[in-house]
Structure formats: C-alpha cells, structure tokens
C-alpha cells in the first residue's frame, strides 16, 4: 500500500473571517490527505444532503424559499432543521469545534474503508481518518455521535425525507443548475461532484466515504475538491461579493449578478441572463427579450409574427432568420436527386436529401409508401387510396416527385409486373417522357368507381383555391378566356391522344378528382394545376367494353367542336381505333404499350421522323440562303409551336405543360429557380431561360391586344380550313382553343397598333398551291423551323447591309418560312412586284402576311416586305431598282415571340460597313439574341430618314399604346440629341401618367415621379447605351456621361479646387474631393512657395512662369495615358524629389509625376463617387475607359516616357 502523506496542519484554515457565524463545524487536526490515484476511490459517489442548515439562511432568507443553490436537489426538510438548530443554539449547546476550523477528513486507503457513514441511522457514527490503525480526536467523534443522534430523532418526528429514502424514490427529481461562472472556475469541483452525483450509488457504504461541506452540505470524495469549494464559495473578505440568500461568495460582481438569477422564478431567469449590463438596448415588446443590435430584434420579431421571408429554392422550405437560411443553403442537403437528364443518380439514396419524403414531418404516408416501394411490394387498394391524402400543399410537390422518380415511375414501375394488367399505373404510356407524369400513380383504383373518390374533395379544393389565386393574381390584365387557357384546357388534343380513353370519361373520373371550373367545364386537378402533365398515351386493358364505347362517343363529340379546323379525314383517323394499343401511323395493333412504343419510335415506316432519318436529302429543305437551320432555332421553334408537337418521339411536347405550370406560378424565376426547373424538365438551363423570356413577351403582347376578340371571329367561317399539319407548328395558341383565340399573326398585328387593320389575303395571291404530302404535325426536327437570323450568322451577308445587292435580295426578299417543308414558290420577282406599294403611301400593306386560317400550306409570314418611299434622300438609291429586299428595321417582328415593333433605328442610321452613330452596335446579321435587349424601344417603322419620320407623323396617327407615346408632332423631333437621349420616339412629355400622377414602367410594376427617371429606368430592361465614344467606342446610357468621359481623352479639366489648385475632369471627382479631402488638401500658398523654391534652385524660371507651365501641364494630359501604368513607370526611377529639383529636365518629370498622382486621386475619387451619380455602371465604365481607351499615339507617347525614365535611371546609376 502506498504510504500516506501526512498533513502538516489545517490546510484550509479560514484566516480572514474575523467573526465567523458558523458554530457547528467539526475540525480534524493533523489528518491524512491521501492522493486519489486508485480506481476504487473514483467509484465513490457524492451525496449532497440538506442535513446541516446554514444559520445565515435562517436570518436572511424566508423559510418558505428553498435554498436551491446550497443543494442541487429540493430539500423537503429545511424548515424542521432550521427550527431544530435554533433550539440547539438558544439552549446553549456547545460543540467542540476547535478553533473554528473546517472539516478535514480523508480516507487512508481502500482497505481501511470498513465502517459506514450512515447519517440517517439512529446510531449515527462517522468514520474518521485512520492513520496506521489509530483513531484521533475521539472526543470529536463522540460529539458527532451525540449530535447526529439527537438530530435524527427530531427529523423523524418532522417526517423528513432522508437521503436513503430519497435515493430509493422512482420519480424524477428537479435539479436547479448553477451559474456558468461557478461551474467553470478552476476546475469546478462542484461540477464534477454533480456529474458523479447523477450516478447511482454502487455500494451501500458509498456515502460513508464522502467529505461533506459544513456550509452547504455538498459531498466530495477528495479533500482538495472540498478545500477549493470552501475557498471559492464560502470564504469571505472585504473584496469578495457574497450572496445574501445562500452565502456564496464571488470574486466579481458580474458573477454574483448571474448567480442571483438562479434565485429568481424560472420565467425571469432567461430574461435576466440574456440582458447584459445596459448594452442590450433593443427589447422585444412581446416577450421582453433584449438584443444588442436592431437587426437581431427584427429577425426575432418574425418568430412572433410568423413571417418567413427566406425560401430555399430547392426544397421550398422557408426561414425567418437569415442565419438559418444561410446554413441551410450552405449545407446543400436539399439538392434534388434528379439529374439533368431526368434519371436518378445511382450513388444517392432516397432518404439522403431533404427532398426525399422522409425529411418532412408530415409525410408519414409517403414514408410508408417509399418503404413498400423499396421492398418491391405492390400497393394495396387502400394504400393507393391513401396517396390522395398525402399532400395538401402544392409547395411539397417536390417530395412526391422525387419519390416517384426514385422508383422509376416514368415507365418501368413496379406495377409493370404486378397485378394491374401488366401496365403502368393509369395506363401511362412508357414513352411519355414527362418527369412529372408519376403524379397519377396509384390513383386509378379509387377512381374507377370506388366510393373513396369523394373523401379528399376538401383537400383538392384547397389546392385548387391556391392555384386559382396564384394564376388570377398574375393574369389580372388578361381576359377570362386567356386565364382559362393558361390554367388548363377544357378539351384535349384529339390528334395527339387517340388512346386517351379512360381519363376524360365522365363516368370514369379523370386523373385526380373532378372539379368544376369558372365556366362549368369539368376537368381534373392534375390538368388544372399542371396543364395535362399526366396525359396518358394508352388506355388500361382492364377497361370494360362499355367504357370504351362511352369514351369513343365522347371523343366524337369533342371532334365535332373542331370541325372548322380539322378535316373529315383527320377526324375519322382519330376515333376509328381498332385496339387500345395501335400505331398512330400505320394502325398496327400491339399487345402492350412497350411494343407499341418500340414500333412507333424506331420501326414504323410510316413515321415521318424515321423517313427523315432514312432519307435525309429528300425531306430536308435548305433555307433560302442555302444554309441549314441551327439547332437553337430548331429548339426554339419546337417549343413555340407547343401543341403542334404531340408525337411520342417528340422530346419537347411533354415539357411544355410543365414549363407553363412553372410559368403560371412564377413569371420571373431567378437563376436558382431556373436551375431547378431545368433539372425537373430535363432541359438545359439556357433553353428554359429563353423559353421564359419569350413566354413573357407573348403574354405581354396578349395582355395589350385591344382587338383580341374582333380579330378572332373571322377564323371560324373559312372556305379552306387548314390542316393541323400546317396550322399547329405556327402558333403557341393551342389548337382546340383556336375558335376563341387568334393566331399568333393576328395577335401580333393587333398589338402593333401602328398600322391599319390586318388585311387577309388568299394564298393564291403569291403562290402556286400544290398538294403537299401530309406530314406528321408533331415533328420536332422540321427542316424549316423558325429561322431567327434570316440566314445563318456564319454565312450571313446582312452585316454589310446593301439593299441593292443580289445577296440582300436573295436572302431577304422572301418572307421567313415558319411552316413545314413545302415546294418552291413562284419566283421572287413576282413576289416583289405584287407587294410593291405606291410612293408616299402611308397605309402599310400586309400582303406578305397570310392568315393561318385561310392558307393551309403557305408559311405564316411574320416579316414585312420593305416599302419604298419617294423621298429625295433615297430616290437616287432605290427609284430604279424594282426588287425589294427585307428591311430588318420594319414594323413586323422577325419571330413569333417579339412584339411587332421595330427594335432598331431606321436603315439610314446604319451605314453598310459599320455605324458611327452613338448607341448603335455593328449589325450582326439579325442575330436572334441581339433582339431581346431592344424589344421595348422602337424607332418609327418604315422610315428611312428624319424627313421621312417627320413627314409620316404629319399624315398618320399611331393607334393604341404606341400612338399615346408618340402623339404630338412638335414634341416628337427636336434633333439627333432627343433621338438618342430620349430614346427615339418615346417623347418625355407624352409618356402617360398613371391615376396617381406617377410615370409607370410598362415592362414592370415600378413607378416614377419624373419621366426622365422612367427613361433612365427603362435602360435597365433594354441594356441600351445610345451614346458612344468616338475614340474608344465605349457606350453610355446618358449624354452627360459621354461628355465627362470624353474629357479623359481630351485632357480637359474644368473643375479646380480653390485650396490646392488640383483640377478635375469629372464633376463627381470634384465633389468627392471638396466633400472629403478639402480639409487637408494642399493650400495654394504652399504650391506657390514650392514653385518659388524650384525657381531659385533652377535660376532660369520665374515663379509665375513656373506656375503657368504647371497649370498648362495639368490641363493637357496625354490622351489615353493609363494611370495604372503611370504609377508603375513613375516610381521606377529611384530619385528623390530633391534630385529631380537639381536638374532642369527632371523638374518637368516631377511635374509629370504630380500630374499622374492627381490622375490617380481623380480615378480613386470617381470610384468612390456613388452618391453623385446614380448609375454605378457609368463609373465602372469610365474607370475602365481610363485604362483601355488609349490610341496609338498615346501608346507611343507612353513608350517614350518609359524610355526616358529608363535613361534617367541609367544616368543616375552611372
């Protein structure tokens, strides 16, 4: 056994307490203090008893308040103990507690722990420290026995709860924690004791081996811990702060203040702990919580208001605090499981993302569904019914989508080999590539006549109400029929869905629950919200013969409504279906959807797509210029033709409904939302962005169409109704709504508002119609799609725009071909002759635009044949030429989605090679992307010069929206400055005010108090910069920006500081200097003194002469001299200013360096000048101009300057 270490004496003597109040403390002198290296000592447990009451507590605290700090447990016998100790003290009972010293007791070793420390027994004894078998201080032991025996009898009479009884209880004890400072001070022996106190006692004699604090009854197994506890908690002096309730002492007042919180009620503790010492000024009025910063209080108030402004773009989870949102985004746990190609990533599990169904606490039903699907078990009827109850909010749609995509419901679902007739749920055709078609999985069982159909009608109505409000809010300006077209279509496409039976039958409810729309038409929830996302390509084999007969009758009724648009042959082909799975091309029957898809997609010889692949040279028709269309134009035309593509092999048809559904909910998605949409539909993000932009333009043109109904009426009674092959690919308007909606050409003509009403001409006016072989209307790779550039950008000759050249005639005299392939038209000269108009004609002829309802084979001509005006400015150029080339600046749009307004200035403003007019970039051959930023800013249509424009304004009044903007001939033209600065024909004085007197932007919902502010704002939509620098070709939005920029090239500095004499070229730089640097800039007197000193040293220049030279050098800065290069070149000579002053030549070098420093400060001031100029792009452009706008002469000058410095350095080195 390890020999014990003898203590020299009382090691924790209370030396600084003059008059201690505590009388009942036992002291053991010369006891053994052993180490605790053994594991047996660590097995001892601490019991903290409330057996010894503190006389201080009796005097300072009410008896009804329990002393929570003295013990971690609730004491139920505090009052009887206090009374008993009062009787002992009043009775004059004295105890031999020697010299008022504290208890020192320790156990020598584990072998000598043989007696119990049973404070609860009637014969209470205490095991004293044993040293070599000798018991010291026997008198103290007997006193302890007598004291505890009497005390225990009194406690039994008071029904006190003993420690033994307390430890045997099975209920939960309430533990009041201590202040953080107390537990963290010097190892905190109390904290260790409290942790060990939570452990159950291992042996019955564990409490006999503890050392108890005589002040607060805490127990410790090591003497050092007890000493530290008494020293830091009970030892008092003048510098310590003592708790008046529990006699704890603290070295700092802040510790005492935090400790006092523990004596407060529980509701007040949190408030007092969070409030600092007067530095939390912002207090919540709801809960009283205070904050140091105001923005913390603002975020905290959202907890009470329920506001959650931050939304995750991936999982749609909302957050009230920006920190929570940021951590959620940075964790990247909600990234979707669907990759770009629509397939699941193999290395990601279903439950590893918040998009998975297990992440939502309300998705227990989906979780069960996922578990069953993972185990490969088919769903029962009741489980399929329960799927309808899973979601009540459309925002949680991603969970269900990811679940369905995870288990492959796009075609290879577990139901394929299950008990549902070997077909996918709802008969969804495996060729349907829509990534959202799995919404209808498992819904056919309760919808085939089972009584569970109406159980979820309330939830469906909630979803419909939400979607209804969203669509109505975004489409407030549209008419009722336009809103209904956006939200859902009442009739499905009969040509595209020959096997659609079972989904639209009234007896067999559609996918989802039937609901009634505003006009009484019955349609499904899925069709209502996602616009036919789940269109079925084949019907269920389990349908009965009666249901097929009823569906066939319904199909016939639907086809009668399209009698004016579809030929009789097409109708017979649509509803004469022999078997559910028959090829739509050759009518061959197949046993199931998979063989049918295989045949239609790859094997059917009647499929035009397969023909095009097998015989590409026969079907592909080159463009007018001999250039094939590019993929981007093909993709764009395929999407714009929307309902014209319904073949199962078409890769874009299934995405249109999804894209329009997203568009209905958010018309302007950000980049994150675009990425999410692109992942959902499996298309590139650039494509989705382009689609949204063009959809916006189309909706804008729809909402501003005043003659929408008028132009749509003549469509029905037509002698030559077009086939769907020629009609559908031309217009985004769906074919079944063509009776009540105009074609895209009439929409554009009605929006134009600057021309007479559309004149419909027969196709025989300018073509020889020949019967064309009937093609599949859903072809996605049409050889002649929407050609946005008139020619390919690589082979285009329109950049060198020469109206009389053969290339211009060859490329642009024909209208753009937007239809399917057709045979060659008449010669172009005939077209030019027939479209020729008389000189000075004001009304514009629309012969080149054919009605889609009257012409079945002719393309929809959306361009405009260039008109000729007999004006003196252009007669010498065009009067002798009978051939008309296409005017790229005409009033007609070059593709469907553009508003029919001219996006570029008249042709006179564009020289053949390259324009020098400010704001006009080189014309890149009608590049489709260059149109978008200029859509909203139009130049007068058809005019070639200013004189033309003024002359036309005299005779013609613009109609509608454009006329309101352009009305007023006197205000229209005030010279080239107004043409460029005021955005051409958008006269500032004629911009309409709103009802509140504000100027509203027609492209967004912003309003402005001044028309100039509105024009400045509109530059943000177009990106137009009409003012261009002639030297460096840098363009600016405003004329005064160009003026100040030109001073960088000219060296002009009209602004000068009156104190330091520094000059500035920009007003912003000057204002910045005067506001921030005027107080410490150099004084003019100092400059004069420096000049005189230089003059005295050089001897050949007078001070006034030197000042004049300096002023001259400051006023003429070399053009394009880069400040950064100046700063790099100037410090290369390691000469001091004095060395420069000694040489006459170097004096001018110093002046140049000072000038460079001034330029550097000027540029720095310009970069800081955010308040003086509201356009930060202008500041950035001007800063860049300073670095990159040097011409050749300035380059040469700069090189010469550098060489001069190098020569100076060499001379100095020698």
From Swiss-Prot:
Phosphothreonine found at: 782
Stated family: Belongs to the delta-EF1/ZFH-1 C2H2-type zinc-finger family.
Compositionally skewed regions (Acidic residues) per UniProt: 1156-1167
Biased composition (Basic residues): 12-24
GO terms (BP aspect): astrocyte activation; cell proliferation in forebrain; central nervous system development; collateral sprouting; corpus callosum morphogenesis; corticospinal tract morphogenesis; developmental pigmentation; endothelial cell migration
Protein name: Zinc finger E-box-binding homeobox 2
Keywords from the UniProt entry: Acetylation, Chromosome, Disease variant, DNA-binding, Epilepsy, Hirschsprung disease, Homeobox, Intellectual disability, Isopeptide bond, Metal-binding, Nucleus, Phosphoprotein, Repeat, Repressor, Transcription, Transcription regulation, Ubl conjugation, Zinc, Zinc-finger
Mod. after translation: Sumoylation on Lys-391 and Lys-866 is promoted by the E3 SUMO-protein ligase CBX4, and impairs interaction with CTBP1 and transcription repression activity.
Gene source species: Homo sapiens
PANTHER family hit by this protein: HISTONE H4 TRANSCRIPTION FACTOR-RELATED (PTHR24391), ZINC FINGER E-BOX-BINDING HOMEOBOX 2 (PTHR24391:SF11)
Zinc finger (C2H2-type): 211-234, 241-263, 282-304, 310-334, 581-605, 999-1021, 1027-1049, 1055-1076
């Amino acid at each position: 056994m390890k020999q014990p270490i003898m203590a020299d004496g009382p090691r924790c003597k209370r030396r600084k307490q003059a008059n201690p109040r505590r009388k009942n403390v036992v002291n053991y002198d010369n006891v053994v203090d052993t180490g605790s290296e053994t594991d047996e000592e660590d097995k001892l447990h601490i019991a903290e008893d409330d057996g010894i009451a503190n006389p201080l507590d009796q005097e300072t605290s009410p008896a009804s308040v329990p002393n929570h700090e003295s013990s971690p447990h609730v004491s139920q016998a505090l009052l009887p103990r206090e009374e008993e100790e009062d009787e002992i003290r009043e009775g004059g009972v004295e105890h031999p507690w020697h010299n008022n010293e504290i208890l020192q007791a320790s156990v020598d070793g584990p072998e000598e722990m043989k007696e119990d420390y049973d404070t609860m027994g009637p014969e209470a004894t205490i095991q004293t420290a044993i040293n070599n078998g000798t018991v010291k201080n026997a008198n103290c032991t007997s006193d302890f026995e007598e004291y505890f025996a009497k005390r225990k009898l009194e406690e039994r009479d008071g029904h006190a709860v003993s420690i033994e009884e307390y430890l045997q209880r099975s209920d939960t004890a309430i533990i009041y924690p201590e202040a953080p400072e107390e537990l963290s001070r010097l190892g905190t022996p109390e904290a260790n004791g409290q942790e060990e106190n939570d452990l159950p006692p291992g042996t019955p004699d564990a409490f006999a081996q503890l050392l108890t604090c005589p002040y607060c009854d805490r127990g410790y197994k090591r003497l050092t811990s007890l000493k530290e506890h008494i020293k830091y908690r009970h030892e008092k002096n003048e510098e310590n702060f003592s708790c008046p309730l529990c006699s704890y002492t603290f070295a700092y007042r802040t510790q005492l203040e935090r400790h006092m919180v523990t004596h407060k009620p529980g509701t007040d503790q949190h408030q007092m702990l969070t409030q600092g010492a007067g530095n939390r000024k912002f207090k919540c009025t709801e809960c009283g919580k205070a904050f140091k910063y105001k923005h913390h209080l603002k975020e905290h108030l959202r907890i009470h208001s329920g506001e959650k402004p931050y939304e995750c773009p991936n999982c749609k989870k909302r957050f009230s605090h920006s920190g929570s949102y940021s951590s959620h985004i940075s964790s990247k746990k909600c990234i979707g499981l669907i990759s770009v190609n629509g397939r699941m990533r193999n290395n990601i599990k279903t439950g590893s993302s918040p998009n998975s169904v297990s992440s939502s606490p309300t998705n227990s039903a989906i979780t069960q569904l996922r578990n069953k699907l993972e185990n490969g078990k088919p769903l029962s009827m009741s489980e399929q019914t329960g799927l309808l109850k899973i979601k009540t909010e459309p925002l949680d749609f991603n969970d269900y989508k990811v679940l369905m995509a995870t288990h492959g419901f796009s075609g290879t679902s577990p139901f394929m080999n299950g008990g549902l007739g070997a077909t996918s749920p709802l008969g969804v055709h495996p060729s349907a590539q829509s990534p959202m078609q799995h919404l209808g999985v498992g819904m056919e069982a309760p919808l085939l006549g089972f009584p569970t159909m109406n159980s979820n009608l309330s939830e469906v109505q909630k979803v419909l109400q939400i979607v209804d409000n969203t669509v109505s809010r975004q489409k407030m300006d549209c008419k009722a029929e336009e809103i209904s077209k956006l939200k859902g279509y009442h009739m499905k496409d009969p040509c595209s869905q020959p096997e659609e039976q079972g989904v639209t039958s009234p007896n067999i409810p559609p996918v989802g629950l039937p609901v009634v729309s505003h006009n009484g038409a019955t349609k499904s929830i899925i069709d209502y919200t996602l616009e036919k996302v789940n269109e079925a390509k084949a019907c269920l084999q389990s349908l009965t013969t009666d249901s097929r007969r009823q569906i066939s009758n319904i199909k016939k009724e639907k086809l009668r409504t399209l009698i004016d648009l579809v030929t009789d042959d097409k109708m017979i082909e649509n509803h004469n279906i022999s078997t559910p799975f028959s090829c739509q091309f050759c009518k061959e029957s197949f046993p199931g959807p998979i063989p049918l898809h295989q045949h239609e997609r790859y094997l059917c010889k009647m499929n035009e797509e397969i023909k095009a692949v097998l015989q590409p040279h026969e079907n592909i028709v080159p463009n007018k210029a001999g250039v094939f269309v590019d993929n981007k134009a093909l993709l764009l035309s395929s999407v714009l033709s929307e309902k014209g593509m319904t073949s199962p092999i078409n890769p874009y048809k299934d995405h249109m409904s999804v894209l329009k559904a997203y568009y209905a909910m958010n018309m302007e998605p950000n980049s994150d939302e675009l990425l999410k949409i692109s992942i959902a539909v499996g298309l590139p993000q650039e494509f989705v962005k382009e689609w949204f932009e063009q959809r916006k333009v189309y909706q804008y043109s729809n909402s501003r169409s005043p003659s929408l109904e008028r132009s749509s009426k003549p469509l029905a009674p037509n002698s030559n109704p077009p086939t769907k092959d020629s009609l559908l690919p031309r217009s985004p308007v769906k074919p079944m709504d063509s009776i009540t909606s105009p074609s895209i050409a009439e929409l554009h003509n009605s929006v134009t508002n600057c021309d007479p009403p559309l004149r419909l001409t027969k196709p025989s006016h300018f073509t020889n119609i020949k019967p064309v072989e009937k093609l599949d209307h859903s072809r996605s790779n049409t050889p002649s799609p929407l050609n946005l550039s008139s020619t390919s950008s690589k082979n285009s000759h329109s950049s060198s725009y020469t109206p009389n050249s053969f290339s211009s005639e060859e490329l642009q005299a024909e209208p753009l071909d937007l239809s399917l392939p057709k045979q060659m038209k008449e010669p172009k000269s005939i077209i030019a002759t027939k479209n020729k108009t008389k000189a000075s004609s004001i009304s514009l002829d629309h012969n080149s635009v054919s009605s889609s309802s009257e012409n079945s084979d002719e393309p929809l001509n959306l361009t405009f044949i260039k008109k000729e005006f007999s004006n003196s400015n252009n007669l010498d150029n065009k009067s002798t030429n009978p051939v008309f080339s296409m005017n790229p600046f005409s009033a007609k749009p070059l593709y469907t989605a553009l508003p029919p307004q001219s996006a570029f200035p008249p042709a006179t403003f564009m020289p053949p090679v390259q324009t020098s007019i400010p704001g006009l970039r080189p014309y890149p051959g009608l590049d489709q992307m260059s149109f978008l930023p200029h859509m909203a800013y139009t130049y007068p249509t058809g005019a070639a010069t200013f004189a033309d424009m003024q002359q036309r304004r005299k005779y013609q009044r613009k109609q509608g929206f454009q006329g309101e903007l352009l009305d007023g001939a006197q205000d229209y033209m005030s010279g080239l400055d107004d043409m460029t600065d005021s955005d051409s024909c958008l006269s500032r004085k004629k911009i309409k005010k709103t009802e509140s007197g504000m100027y509203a932007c027609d492209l967004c919902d912003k309003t402005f108090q001044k028309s100039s502010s509105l024009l400045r704002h509109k530059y943000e939509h177009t990106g137009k910069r009409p003012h261009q620098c002639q030297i460096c070709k840098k363009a600016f939005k405003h004329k005064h920006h160009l003026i100040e920029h030109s001073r960088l090239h000219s060296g002009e500095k009209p602004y000068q500081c009156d104190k330091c004499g520094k000059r500035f070229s920009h007003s912003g730089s000057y204002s910045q200097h005067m506001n921030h640097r005027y107080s410490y800039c150099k004084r003019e007197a100092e400059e004069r003194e420096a000049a005189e000193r230089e003059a005295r040293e050089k001897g050949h220049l007078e001070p006034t002469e030197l000042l004049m030279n300096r002023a001259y050098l400051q006023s003429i800065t070399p053009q394009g001299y880069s400040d950064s290069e100046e700063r790099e070149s100037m410090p290369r000579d390691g000469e001091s200013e004095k060395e420069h002053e000694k040489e006459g030549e170097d004096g001018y070098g110093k002046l140049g360096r000072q000038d460079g420093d001034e330029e550097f400060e000027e540029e720095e001031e310009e970069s800081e000048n955010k308040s003086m100029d509201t356009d930060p792009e202008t500041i950035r452009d001007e800063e860049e101009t300073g670095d990159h706008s040097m011409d050749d002469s300035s380059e040469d000058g700069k090189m010469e300057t550098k060489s001069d410095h190098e020569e100076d350095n060499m001379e100095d080195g020698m």
